[in-house]
């Protein structure tokens, strides 16, 4: 997972931090995995 996130986002923020505030739609629990704070 680390390699994948580090490759796509440049830093493993996907698993490290859950940007709940970035997902006001309430889908943060699964969106945070695929779409980190970078998006």
Swiss-Prot record:
Q: Which residues carry this modification: N-acetylserine?
A: 1
Q: Name one GO cellular component term.
A: extracellular space
Q: Which residues carry this modification: Valine amide?
A: 13
One GO biological process term: regulation of corticosterone secretion
Phosphoserine modified-residue sites = 31
MF terms in GO: G protein-coupled receptor binding; hormone activity
Query: Where would one find coiled-coil regions in this protein?
Result: none
Assigned keywords, A-Z: Acetylation, Amidation, Cleavage on pair of basic residues, Hormone, Phosphoprotein, Secreted
Signal peptide boundaries? none
Q: Where in the cell is it found?
A: Secreted
Quote the InterPro entries the UniProt record gives: Mcrtin_ACTH_cent (IPR013531), PMOC (IPR001941), POMC-derived_peptides (IPR050878)
Annotated tissue distribution = Expressed in the pituitary gland.
What is the predominant subcellular site recorded for this chain? Answer: secreted
Query: In the UniProt entry for this protein, what further remark is given in the free-text comments?
Result: Residues 16-17 were deduced from the amino acid composition and by homology with other mammalian corticotropins.
**Name of this chain's protein:** Pro-opiomelanocortin
Species name: Oryctolagus cuniculus
Source organism lineage? Eukaryota, Metazoa, Chordata, Craniata, Vertebrata
């Amino acid at each position: 997972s680390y390699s994948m996130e580090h490759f796509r986002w440049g830093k493993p923020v996907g698993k490290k931090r859950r940007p709940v505030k970035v997902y006001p739609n309430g889908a943060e629990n699964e969106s945070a995995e695929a779409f980190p704070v970078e998006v």
